[in-house]
Curated annotation (Swiss-Prot):
GO molecular function: DNA binding
Organism: Shigella boydii serotype 18 (strain CDC 3083-94 / BS512)
Name of one Pfam family that matches: SfsA
Keywords per UniProt: DNA-binding
Claim: Cell inner membrane is one of the keywords in the record: no
Record family assignment: Belongs to the SfsA family.
DNA-binding region: 201-220
Biological function: Binds to DNA non-specifically. Could be a regulatory factor involved in maltose metabolism.
UniProt xrefs under PANTHER family: SUGAR FERMENTATION STIMULATION PROTEIN A (PTHR30545:SF2)
Taxonomic superkingdom: Bacteria
Protein name: Sugar fermentation stimulation protein A
Amino acid sequence: MEFSPPLQRATLIQRYKRFLADVITPDGRELTLHCPNTGAMTGCATRGDTVWYSTSDNTKRKYPHTWELTQSQSGAFICVNTLWANRLTKEAILNESISELSGYSSLKSEVKYGAERSRIDFMLQADSRPDCYIEVKSVTLAENEQGYFPDAVTERGQKHLRELMNVAAEGLRAVIFFAVLHSAITRFSPARHIDEKYAQLLSEAQQRGVEILAYKAEISAESMALKKSLPVTL
């Protein structure tokens, strides 16, 4: 996926009120960007980081500029717009870049399912195979090349794991897919030190037949694409 029109560069001053960030452009203008990320954004929003932002042509938007990427002071690219996790995953499935999810003839998004009234991110179907339910999570928390999810306690994420376990129990295919959107990450684990319950449920889900996949995106200021499978340690 290529960014079109091209992203613009600025330097981060601060992120605040979760959804806003102040930046300064190379020519000295100060802008307020929309921040499309409700998470803690640990390591993704340090003062002085380079920010890459898009600009909407919707004149009715109060904040027409959207923070898309961080380029950390160590040089790592991080996609902070959580909407891209699903977009990149869908693109990779359709391109058959994810070997474990290839060979299906139909892809549906936001399908209602489960006892807890959830919506699955993607459902894959083929005549000769069980339906495949895929829940996507965006991974941006990194420590010494180790990627972690979640970056804060997530009851919603815990619910999704319970739903996937029920799917697997019905004889269908259930997949939790971690889209790693941080260029410095080389391996993935659940963030037991942040949400122990989630880590426990992820291990239980694997034991009950839920598949765990982690794929890393190649990220630059020009483009992004999920390319590489990463090792997962529970």
